[in-house]
């Protein structure tokens, strides 16, 4: 195929023929021969490399570099042969690892019989005695069972650690709540009551006249309008002690209740005397002015 240039230039440029049909080729020739396509591709690649080497992308070279001719890819059969790895030649008595069909886990086993025609075998699981028919292609090496057990143990240990951490945190929260519930009710600004004296004191001994449980502490005195304190607020009133169970009324409990009642009585008395003293000082200041 030829094309003439216009304008009477007389120059002709012959294009490269990529494919021509029915030009004397025999019927037995390979109709899928892509030699011309390979040559055209090699020519384009060579011209592109030459343009990159010269630093000019627009200039193309007519002389292609000598490049190796690519051969058609006809390695399908070889690739299939290489992809199919040969099976291991298992025989009776070999140690292996097999997947138990009931749970899908890998267990160590021993081959008892092999059927080469069916490519199957019968295995006995070590330590269990169960027999099962397995395909020879499904058998694993004994090291696979060890790796599987190691992974399972790691997962179990991680779950156990997370469970222990949650139990430890819940126990710490319960212990904190229990310690708070056992804390003494003396949370006001006043100090706690004095400690109980030694075992030398008790009902029926010198210095004590009470033989039974003391009466409940008196309520705090009501504040009259004329006794309102001049300062913004006074000390908070301590709560009464918890009631004593009748089953726990012994000498020590009775003595402790008596001392608590004395302490609260002195507290309310001092509180009242402070109001009186403050009132007297206020009257003196008013007379002086």
UniProtKB/Swiss-Prot annotation:
Record PTM Phosphoserine, positions in chain: 26, 29
Disordered as annotated region, ranges: 1-27, 55-88, 150-226
Record Pfam families: SMN_G2-BD, SMN_Tudor, SMN_YG-box
Domain of life: Eukaryota
Region Required for interaction with RPP20/POP7, residue ranges: 95-205
Coiled-coil regions listed: none
Region of interest (Required for interaction with SYNCRIP), residue spans: 274-289
Modified residues (Phosphothreonine): 23, 67
Cross-link Glycyl lysine isopeptide (Lys-Gly) (interchain with G-Cter in SUMO2): residue positions: 49, 205
Residue ranges with Pro residues bias: 212-226
Region P2 (binding site for SM B), residue ranges: 235-262
Xref: PANTHER family: SURVIVAL MOTOR NEURON PROTEIN, SURVIVAL MOTOR NEURON-LIKE PROTEIN 1
Annotated family: Belongs to the SMN family.
Assembly, per entry: Homooligomer; may form higher order homooligomers in the dimer to octamer range. Part of the core SMN complex that contains SMN1, GEMIN2/SIP1, DDX20/GEMIN3, GEMIN4, GEMIN5, GEMIN6, GEMIN7, GEMIN8 and STRAP/UNRIP. Part of the SMN-Sm complex that contains SMN1, GEMIN2/SIP1, DDX20/GEMIN3, GEMIN4, GEMIN5, GEMIN6, GEMIN7, GEMIN8, STRAP/UNRIP and the Sm proteins SNRPB, SNRPD1, SNRPD2, SNRPD3, SNRPE, SNRPF and SNRPG. Component of an import snRNP complex composed of KPNB1, RNUT1, SMN1 and ZNF259.
Domain remarks in the Swiss-Prot or TrEMBL record: The Tudor domain mediates association with dimethylarginines, which are common in snRNP proteins.
Official protein name in the record: Survival motor neuron protein
Species in which this protein is naturally found: Rattus norvegicus
